[in-house]
Amino acid sequence: MKSIYISIIMKSIYKICIDGELNELKKRRNEIYEIIEDIPNDGDDLREDEDDISFAAAYCKDHDTALEMYKYLYEKCGYPRHCVHYAMVGAAASRNAKLINYIYNDVDEHEKEEFIGDLEDELAMTDHPNPRVFIEYALFELNKV
């Protein structure tokens, strides 16, 4: 019974994230905590990328709002760190260089090479015309600004 309830609130929050409704997301903090409790542990998490609300937050078309929603989920609500991959996939799909840069600068040093490889794969799957140029811009050029 609880999984049906979690599924319903997850779909609702997912839509809020896609639509970029940051203030509405903040009002739903208790429900976010319930979703977090229901997320499988790292290694047991076999969900699809699109099944995570951090994907939806990162996929938001307003890139500045996407960054703020990401920060809210991970820094304020304590969203599980093993779900960062889902956010990276959403950011790659929406071509959000600012969020990709933020995520990259926040991952552990030993995870950066794997992150770049995964990012390149995701960009290729979304038919990005030149993943390498985008990655160089997102990860290195934005740091110079």
Predicted regions and their residues:
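Ankyrin repeat (ANK) tandem alpha-helical domains that serve as protein-protein interaction scaffolds
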Residues: M1-V145
